[in-house]
Amino acid sequence: MEEKEKLLGRMMRLCAGRECCRSDIRRKLAALPPAAAQEVLDTLCREGYLDDARYARAFARDKSALQGWGSLKIQLALQRKQIDATDIAAALEAIDLPAADAKMEQVLRAKWKSLAREEDPARKEAKFFRYALGRGYGYQEIKRIYDYLGRD
């Protein structure tokens, strides 16, 4: 019983310091019996320390604005964390699209510059598209930026 209380305190401090989702905390509580771990999770949710919808919004906002991830990569990462589909959709809707587009252009422009020494245009295009798809951008978005950068 004492171990459960100690872990609850640790998880409260962790959740107070940064956003966490249920799957993150569940993984950290693996040492506890399943019933005790569920009780800790329920307490964290009830007291407002843990909210998957809030986590999804913060995750999507940060990955888009700070790391330049596209919506497809964000969606996949949230699915891996077992976030509900409605929370994922709401988080993706909350992304600041003009800022995300500007960040995407900045990231892809930097990649384009790094490919300047590539002499074969087909290889240059393949590397550019592979990189951009890996960042989670959609094909139409990538094509628009590629056409724009290819004219420079």
PLM feature spans:
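An alpha-helical, amphipathic repeat domain used for nucleic-acid recognition
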Residues: 1-152
